[in-house]
Amino acid sequence: MSQCVRTARDLFVFVGFLNREGMGRIMLETITAVNQAVNNFVWGVPAMVCIIGVGLLLSVRTGFLQIRKFPYVIKTTIGRMFRKKDASDGAMTPFQAVCTALAGTVGTGNIAGVAGAIAIGGPGAVFWMWCSALLGMCTKFAEVTLAVHFRERNAAGEWVGGPMYYIKNGLGKHWQFLAVLYSLFGVLTVFGTGNATQVNTIVAAIDTALLEYNVVGNGALSTLNLVVGIVVAMLVAMVLLGGIKRIGSVSERLVPFMALFYIVLAVGVVVLNLPRFPLVLEAIFAGAFNPAAFTGGTIGSLFISMQKGVSRGIFSNEAGLGTGSIAHACADTKKPVKQGMFGIFEVFADTIVICTLTAMVILCSGITVNYGTAAGAELTISGFTTTYGGWASIFTAVALCCFAFSTIIGWGLYGSRFLAFLCHNDKVVRPFFVVYSFVSILGATVDLGLLWSVADTFNGLMSIPNLIALLLLSGTVVNLTKEFFASEKANG
């Protein structure tokens, strides 16, 4: 009896403590701590080692296809992507599919993320970013090839595929739980990583540009942000509710425009600062193995340079997460390996071209970089404005808005596929698009920092079931690749 009394008393004291200290605050701190620990794992060294390891394994097993067949990749992607071709019902053209995938991967990280990697890891981080992209090309090739090979038609007659389908159809029912986990993590990711954080970037870019030119005052920003959120929500709804055809049509117009727009201006920075270019290349290669010369670091700086470069390459092109393969699965093609070539091209365009040009803007412009301190888009903006003048801030705002909007569209498609797979019902897609569009308004007006951080963690967790599937299905990738090139050789 006395034991029961003591237990009851202790429980009462504990409850009183929670009330006094604030149960909500304690729970919030606990969630934050747990989320941070998991986030550090899935976006940290263990995850990077796994992703790089899978990319290396696939590269070895395919004979480093991404290097050996790179001329063929260019021939079958850039060489054919502008040919006019109508897709069959329920599908996109291969070009529309790669543009939709690029819409999801080419985002604000290409501007802000690269700047952060250079600021912390030094110029040598660019070299390690290239290395990770080289292996990521083969990872993305495998993801796309498997997605097209194991895809299926939904009730609406549309092609659906991606990691959850190549797990389901490639590994069998005993691995079904991995497909469910992948889709669940995906649904918990799309509203934060794919939507709200992107809208927040759009709002911040517009606010900064308008304040700089005194178009509006600080007092009007809350109203302006609401208007921007509503406009973005309406545009997102118009695109997504138009179905797979409209998503593909918008992507094939928006992505090439924004990429070319950014590339031309970035190349201009390099050309106008051409005398610095050889020195920048020297800094990249020398800094890869001796970053202390630039960052002022000591023993740990080489590891930091590698970590920042590799992580930026992985996080930018999403090789290992499997998301881009969902868009590629919509392509009107009968040859999985040929669509896989677009996966290689996707990583090349995202990381080798766009991320590298961002690095060149920062390093060639001659701006002062405070190595060892965190930085973001402001470093890239400074590189443009130093070369072109103050008007370049407007250009950067436009680029950020385009990159962010395209990401919202791409992740909207991914989210609909995740939810339909979980619910075994395509009727949830349109209501999802409505809710997803509405989140754009919240992203523009409400600070939900912890929720978006949790979404980022779930985004990282998506890599675990996908990497397991890639390992188990690597033999299928090798066989499909051998059969494809044997057929190509036989047909001349």
Regions of interest found by a model, annotated:
Residues 64-92, 116-126, 130, 138-173, ...:
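Flexible loop linkers connecting adjacent transmembrane helices
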Residues 14, 18-108, 118-125, 136, ...:
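N-terminal alpha-helical transmembrane segments of multi-pass membrane transport
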